[in-house]
Amino acid sequence: MKTKAGFVALIGKPNAGKSTLLNTLLNAHLALVSHKANATRKLMKCIVPFKDKEWYESQIIFLDTPGLHHQEKLLNQCMLSQALKAMGDAELCVFLASVHDDLKGYEEFLSLCQKPHILALSKIDTATHKQVLQKLQEYQQYDSQFLALVPLSAKKSQNLNALLECISQHLSPSAWLFEKDLMSDEKMRDIYKEIIRESLFDFLSDEIPYESDVMIDKFIEEERIDKVYARIIVEKESQKKIVIGKNGVNIKRIGTNARLKMQEVGEKKVFLNLQVIAQKSWSKEEKSLQKLGYIHRRNRD
């Protein structure tokens, strides 16, 4: 069997559809998806197998990154750092741009990325044929910069094989780097954490999801059930009250939604215990971000 393998950084502005694309390619719910922009905070590896036209069995390891953006808050700086590191570590990059975005995001990406890349135009199912053609023509001025320009829709599964074929063509022959059926090397406790965060985005409005995070205090993995004890961290006491809700109605909804998603991903029953705490300025404190896994002591960039 001829094989290829390689790391591919998936880069884009917030809400370009990176996580939706990966979940569709995996046919599983691993990456955090929200209609709110900039939900992804940590890099995640997602492993997609693909047989290309030259009969290579390719193992494409996508690095799902936080959206490219610039803010002074320490948490946001950590998120940008992860995206930049992924670009440096990858063999190839895919820049995902919404058909509705202007070209500024791609131009910023060009100033940051030194690796060969594919430009993918997402959400084409939400635009007219004329709008898609117009956007493709706008990007053609940069045709000397990208390896290929691929219009696609993750929700409608349009042109996804074309994207994978293009990626596979530019990977080097190599033995596979991970086991055959592995979709991610993420620990289950980290996947569960992201599922809880996704539920916060699903049920809470305004700034609260952006000023909150999740700490897994205890994770007990048994044959038939996973037991998860977690804290939702917010910035203010007023936010804590909203997360809990009157008579606990909000926290119950968040918990039930998260637990059902966990059971689907983990393929077993899940016991979930959620607590809510207020910790002022947690997103600006290095010690707090270390505990949450955004900063590593050996590498604080």
Curated annotation (Swiss-Prot):
<dbReference type="InterPro" id="IPR015946">
    <property type="entry name" value="KH_dom-like_a/b"/>
</dbReference>
<dbReference type="GO" id="GO:0003924">
    <property type="term" value="F:GTPase activity"/>
</dbReference>
<dbReference type="InterPro" id="IPR005662">
    <property type="entry name" value="GTPase_Era-like"/>
</dbReference>
<dbReference type="GO" id="GO:0043024">
    <property type="term" value="F:ribosomal small subunit binding"/>
</dbReference>
<feature type="region of interest" description="G4">
    <location>
        <begin position="122"/>
        <end position="125"/>
    </location>
</feature>
<keyword id="KW-0690">Ribosome biogenesis</keyword>
<dbReference type="InterPro" id="IPR005225">
    <property type="entry name" value="Small_GTP-bd"/>
</dbReference>
<dbReference type="GO" id="GO:0019843">
    <property type="term" value="F:rRNA binding"/>
</dbReference>
<comment type="similarity">
    <text>Belongs to the TRAFAC class TrmE-Era-EngA-EngB-Septin-like GTPase superfamily. Era GTPase family.</text>
</comment>
<keyword id="KW-0472">Membrane</keyword>
<dbReference type="InterPro" id="IPR030388">
    <property type="entry name" value="G_ERA_dom"/>
</dbReference>
<feature type="region of interest" description="G3">
    <location>
        <begin position="64"/>
        <end position="67"/>
    </location>
</feature>
<keyword id="KW-0342">GTP-binding</keyword>
<feature type="region of interest" description="G1">
    <location>
        <begin position="12"/>
        <end position="19"/>
    </location>
</feature>
<keyword id="KW-0963">Cytoplasm</keyword>
<keyword id="KW-0699">rRNA-binding</keyword>
<keyword id="KW-0547">Nucleotide-binding</keyword>
<dbReference type="GO" id="GO:0005525">
    <property type="term" value="F:GTP binding"/>
</dbReference>
<feature type="binding site">
    <location>
        <begin position="12"/>
        <end position="19"/>
    </location>
    <ligand>
        <name>GTP</name>
    </ligand>
</feature>
<dbReference type="InterPro" id="IPR027417">
    <property type="entry name" value="P-loop_NTPase"/>
</dbReference>
<protein>
    <recommendedName>
        <fullName>GTPase Era</fullName>
    </recommendedName>
</protein>
<feature type="binding site">
    <location>
        <begin position="64"/>
        <end position="68"/>
    </location>
    <ligand>
        <name>GTP</name>
    </ligand>
</feature>
<feature type="region of interest" description="G5">
    <location>
        <begin position="152"/>
        <end position="154"/>
    </location>
</feature>
<dbReference type="Pfam" id="PF07650">
    <property type="entry name" value="KH_2"/>
</dbReference>
<dbReference type="GO" id="GO:0005886">
    <property type="term" value="C:plasma membrane"/>
</dbReference>
<dbReference type="InterPro" id="IPR006073">
    <property type="entry name" value="GTP-bd"/>
</dbReference>
<dbReference type="InterPro" id="IPR009019">
    <property type="entry name" value="KH_sf_prok-type"/>
</dbReference>
<comment type="subunit">
    <text>Monomer.</text>
</comment>
<dbReference type="GO" id="GO:0070181">
    <property type="term" value="F:small ribosomal subunit rRNA binding"/>
</dbReference>
<comment type="function">
    <text>An essential GTPase that binds both GDP and GTP, with rapid nucleotide exchange. Plays a role in 16S rRNA processing and 30S ribosomal subunit biogenesis and possibly also in cell cycle regulation and energy metabolism.</text>
</comment>
<keyword id="KW-1003">Cell membrane</keyword>
<feature type="region of interest" description="G2">
    <location>
        <begin position="38"/>
        <end position="42"/>
    </location>
</feature>
<dbReference type="Pfam" id="PF01926">
    <property type="entry name" value="MMR_HSR1"/>
</dbReference>
<dbReference type="GO" id="GO:0005829">
    <property type="term" value="C:cytosol"/>
</dbReference>
<feature type="domain" description="KH type-2">
    <location>
        <begin position="204"/>
        <end position="280"/>
    </location>
</feature>
<keyword id="KW-0997">Cell inner membrane</keyword>
<feature type="binding site">
    <location>
        <begin position="122"/>
        <end position="125"/>
    </location>
    <ligand>
        <name>GTP</name>
    </ligand>
</feature>
<dbReference type="GO" id="GO:0000028">
    <property type="term" value="P:ribosomal small subunit assembly"/>
</dbReference>
<feature type="domain" description="Era-type G">
    <location>
        <begin position="4"/>
        <end position="173"/>
    </location>
</feature>
<keyword id="KW-0694">RNA-binding</keyword>
<dbReference type="InterPro" id="IPR004044">
    <property type="entry name" value="KH_dom_type_2"/>
</dbReference>
